[in-house]
């Protein structure tokens, strides 16, 4: 939740899951990790579904930060959703109302626009899998990167590495255009959207029948399997990138979505890798009590301690792993980057929305409260740095990626670029049914006072300066839990320190 001024954030929220309590010293609830302009949550929960949507649409269409930038047609979106909710209300169909709102939010290509999930309803639509995980390759082809050996797909002869040719009679990528991606988080870039469509075409209601045509790479034989979706606890998504490789415990617990991966006990982790290369993982730019002590340790202090360890070890290079980084505070992000900069450098101008006037403004003065700089600090690491990034590196995590990319000694590496969502989040609305809708109302501006990082026409975020292709080989390795990106970063640094 990117924020214009750390001193403003005094809100705390305790999360408890399986005996672990999270004390969040900044606001993160449902407003995906961007700047929070202090505006109260608007409660529409006592209104009818149709009235609540009208209230929501009136507000979000006025406040959303990137209407012109992204070309959002609010009239078309509003009319389409209103018709669905009218029908849902007439038939008292709560699920149809919820799905209509999810489709409404998902139509906006922004990772900061979010309709909170109701997992029990989501599972009615995408709770079933077909026994294999489809992976989109860099060349546009699709393979099964993993196959459940107990599934009908496996019994029909499908194996990991097989090319997926057709789905229900259509070319696979064409069929993927119909995937129920409204139950996933929003995609700000086409790169991210295309990957999600392919992954979610193999999700459906339990009991759904489907036909898949696939090809073995070794004999070029074409095979057909008739499959039925079964409850699989979402394993086909877990076996794909990034879930198969990169843990995501903070996001899962914040968003209240199922998660079976490794838990986290610290926001920052440090270790020395082969060749005396330092590795620092940062899960987010915020303070969280992950060990239920009753207080949240300083993530910034932990980060600076990790950099100090790298300096003390005279590390030959440093890998900053910000894949799946959930974001956090602008102030903390700029402060972290100070450990790599030797000169004061602009981080951003904040073009903040004022709900009283309905306008945005950024101060004309260089040292205003809405202007953030990267201030050099000690310890400072000046060796080569590679930031590992992916499409779940969101908001302030993207600010870290941008800062590393802009260093002469810095690179970004990954299969994909970052999320492309760097706006300043505004208020949220509580809707009938207990879920919320949130959106960004402010903009992050670069030195030219133009919008930075937020996607436009399907392109945005921080791209890898060292891009790793998603080949069939890499997709198969990823499904087995092998960290191809980290290995590539190590190889790069060992050959070009």
Task: Locate each region found by the language model.
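Gram-positive cell-envelope targeting signals
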Residues: 1-38
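Terminal targeting/pro-maturation regions of precursor/exported proteins
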Residues: 36-166, 171-173, 201-220, 224-237, ...
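PDZ domains, with a preference for the canonical peptide-binding region formed by the helix
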Residues: 89-93, 163-213, 332-334, 420-423, ...
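Short Pro/Gly-enriched beta-strand edge/turn motifs at strand-loop
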Residues: 114-116, 192-196, 250
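A recognition module on extended beta-rich or small alphabeta surfaces enriched in W/G with H and D/E
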Residues: 171, 180, 187-189, 451-466
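Cleft-lining beta-strand/loop regions that shape enzyme active-site pockets
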Residues: 208-209, 213-429
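C-terminal "exit" segments of structured domains
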Residues: 425-451
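Low-complexity, Gly/Ser/Thr/Pro-rich intrinsically disordered linker/tail segments
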Residues: 454, 458-497
């Amino acid at each position: 939740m990117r924020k214009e001024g750390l001193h403003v954030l005094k809100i705390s929220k305790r999360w408890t899951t399986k005996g672990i309590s999270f004390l969040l010293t900044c606001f993160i609830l449902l407003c995906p990790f961007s700047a929070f302009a202090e505006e109260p949550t608007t409660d529409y929960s006592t209104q009818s579904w149709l009235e609540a949507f009208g209230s929501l649409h009136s507000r979000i269409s006025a406040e959303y930060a990137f209407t012109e930038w992204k070309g959002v047609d609010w009239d078309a979106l509003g009319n389409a959703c209103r018709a669905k909710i009218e029908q849902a209300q007439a038939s008292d169909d709560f699920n149809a109302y919820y799905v209509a709102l999810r489709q409404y939010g998902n139509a906006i290509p922004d990772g900061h626009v979010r309709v909170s999930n109701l997992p029990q309803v989501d599972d009615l639509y995408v709770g079933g899998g077909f026994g294999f995980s489809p992976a989109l390759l860099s060349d546009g082809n699709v393979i099964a990167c993993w196959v459940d050996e107990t599934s009908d797909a496996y019994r029909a002869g499908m194996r990991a590495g097989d090319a997926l040719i057709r789905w229900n009679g259509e070319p696979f990528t064409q069929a993927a255009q119909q995937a129920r991606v409204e139950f996933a988080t929003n995609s700000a870039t086409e790169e991210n959207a295309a990957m999600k469509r392919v992954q979610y075409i193999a999700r459906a209601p339990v009991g759904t029948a489907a036909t898949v045509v696939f090809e073995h790479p070794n004999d070029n034989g074409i095979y057909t399997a008739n499959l039925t979706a079964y409850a699989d606890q979402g394993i086909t998504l877990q076996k794909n990138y990034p879930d198969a490789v990169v843990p995501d415990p903070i996001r899962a617990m914040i968003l209240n979505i199922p998660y079976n991966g490794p838990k986290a006990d610290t926001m920052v982790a440090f270790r020395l890798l082969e060749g005396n290369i330092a590795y620092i993982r940062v899960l987010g730019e915020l303070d969280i009590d992950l060990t239920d002590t009753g207080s949240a340790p300083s993530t910034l202090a932990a980060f600076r301690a990790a950099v100090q360890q790298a300096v003390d070890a005279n590390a030959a290079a440093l890998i900053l792993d910000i894949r799946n980084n959930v974001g956090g505070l602008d102030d903390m992000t700029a402060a972290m980057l100070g450990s790599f900069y030797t000169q004061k450098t602009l981080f951003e101008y904040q073009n903040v929305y004022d709900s009283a006037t309905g306008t945005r403004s950024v101060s004309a003065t260089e040292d205003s409260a809405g202007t953030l700089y990267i201030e050099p600090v000690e310890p400072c690491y000046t060796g080569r740095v590679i930031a590992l990034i992916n499409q779940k590196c969101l908001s302030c995590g993207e600010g870290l990626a941008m800062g590393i990319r802009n260093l002469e000694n810095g690179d970004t590496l990954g299969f994909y670029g970052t999320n492309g969502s760097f706006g300043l989040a505004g208020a949220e609305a509580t809707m009938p049914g207990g879920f919320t809708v949130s959106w960004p109302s402010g903009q992050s501006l670069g030195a030219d006072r133009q919008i930075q990082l937020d996607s436009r026409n399907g392109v945005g975020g921080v791209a890898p300066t060292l891009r790793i292709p998603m080949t069939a080989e890499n997709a198969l390795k990823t499904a087995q839990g092998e960290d191809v990106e980290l290995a590539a970063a190590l190889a790069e640094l060992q050959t070009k320190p």
